[in-house]
Amino acid sequence: MKTKEKIVQESLSLFNENTFEQSTTNLIAKKSEVLEGSLWYHFNSKQDLVSVHTELFLDSFRKKRIYTEKNDPKELILGLLSIYEVLWDYRYLVRDSFEQFSNENPKLCEKIVDINHEIDEWAKEAIIHAKNVGVLIIQDEDIESVVEISLIIGRHWLDYSMKKYPSKSNLYLRKKGINLLIKTLYPYLSNESREMVDSIYESD
């Protein structure tokens, strides 16, 4: 792995685990096994790393969201759950406060706000589409609540779970989060979709 790629990867891991604010450049360099001068050679600031992470997030998010627009029930369901995986991988972007960027780097601050708005809009569109193709049997008045609960899990389970289960692995916490999302959607799944979800997770 190239030095720049390693710095991007290790900084993402640190920001997720420790928050952006508490991850110092010295810590990033140490975790990346490079001198701090090498870090500065590739990136002028931690904000530059956030900018790279936002691009990587959007690339993954937009590739996965295509599947949530499919009419095939299995592709749609797996697509919905795969978005959660992307949110987990870049969780600090939807968890941390970046108010300090509003003056220091307004363009980056606006980009993070736009990302969060895009996630909100996608969640509602995905639930409505799932209803329209028969994956979900849900009343219009319940859509907003299901969307909001799903977003709360997607955004805040990530941080809460690590505090509640500090000794558990990331894999365990990811799976538990997915199970919470399934439980949120399960009462609204069509019979066919329930059988599909049951078979997928029985095989796992």
Predicted regions and their residues:
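Helix-turn-helix
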Residues: K6, L14-V52
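N-terminal positioning helix adjacent to the helix-turn-helix/winged-helix DNA-binding module
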Residues: T3-E10, V146
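Short, basic, alpha-helical segments at the C-terminal edge of helix-turn-helix-like DNA-binding modules
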Residues: E55-F61
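Amphipathic alpha-helical segments used for helix-helix packing
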Residues: W88-C109, K124-I128
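C-terminal peripheral helix-coil segments that are non-catalytic and often amphipathic
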Residues: D159, K163-D204
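Hydrophobic alpha-helical connector segments
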Residues: R65-L93, E110
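Amphipathic alpha-helical packing segments from all-alpha helical-bundle domains
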Residues: P106-V133, E144-D159, K176-P187
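Secondary-structure edge/capping motif, primarily at the C-terminal ends of alpha-helices
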Residues: R65-T68, V94-F101, A130, G134, ...
